Amino acid sequence: MQDAITAVINASDVQGKYLDTAAMEKLKAYFATGELRVRAASVISANAANIVKEAVAKSLLYSDITRPGGNMYTTRRYAACIRDLDYYLRYATYAMLAGDPSILDERVLNGLKETYNSLGVPIAATVQAIQAMKEVTASLVGADAGKEMGIYFDYICSGLS
C-alpha cells in the first residue's frame, strides 16, 4: 500500500532530485484535505452497515438478480454479495485516507474480475451496487468528501469493467 506522500517522494527519489514545485503542491493539496478525509472515514465507519444496506436496496434488492434463479437468490449468495460490498467500502475508505488507489489494486482488484467471471457473478450488477454505494456515501459525508470517495469507488468500477 502506498499513500500520496510516499508516491510524491518516490517519484522524486527515482529521479534523484529534491521535491519540485509540482510535488510540493501535491503534498499541500493532500494535507489540506486531511481533516475532511478523516471526518469522512469516521462517518463511513460509523454507518458502514447502513451504507451497504441502502446501496443494496437502491440497486439490487428488487431486481431479477434476487429472484429465484438469480445470482443472489440463495441466502449464501446474498450474504456473499453483502460481504463483498462491505469489503469494497472498507478498502475505498482506506484508499481515500491514503489519497492513493494502490491498495485497491493490491487487495481488491488483482484477479477479482477473473474470479467473478469464473463464478458467474454478474459484474454489471456489482458495478451498479458500487455506484449506489457511492451515492449513499456522498449523501452521508457531504459533497466534497463524497467527491473524494467517488474517485475510489469509480476506480473499483473501472477495474471490474
Swiss-Prot record:
One of the GO BP terms on file = photosynthesis
Q: How does it assemble?
A: Heterodimer of an alpha and a beta chain.
Modification after translation: Contains one covalently linked phycocyanobilin chromophore.
**How is this protein situated with respect to the membrane?**
Peripheral membrane protein
Tell me which residues bear N4-methylasparagine.
71
The UniProt similarity line reads: Belongs to the phycobiliprotein family.
Its annotated function is as follows: Light-harvesting photosynthetic bile pigment-protein from the phycobiliprotein complex. Allophycocyanin has a maximum absorption at approximately 650 nanometers.
- Coarse class of the primary localization is membrane
Q: Which domain of life is it from?
A: Bacteria
Carries keyword ATP-binding?
no
Task: Write down the InterPro entries for this protein, in alphabetical order.
Answer: Allophycocyanin_b (IPR006245), Globin-like_sf (IPR009050), Phycobilisome_asu/bsu (IPR012128), Phycobilisome_asu/bsu_sf (IPR038719)
Q: Where does (2R,3E)-phycocyanobilin bind?
A: 81
Keywords attached to this entry: Antenna complex, Bile pigment, Chromophore, Electron transport, Membrane, Methylation, Photosynthesis, Phycobilisome, Thylakoid, Transport
Quote a single Gene Ontology cellular component term.
phycobilisome
Where, subcellularly, is it found? Cellular thylakoid membrane
* UniProt signal peptide: none
Q: What is this protein called?
A: Allophycocyanin beta chain
Q: Which CDD domains match?
A: APC_beta (cd12126)
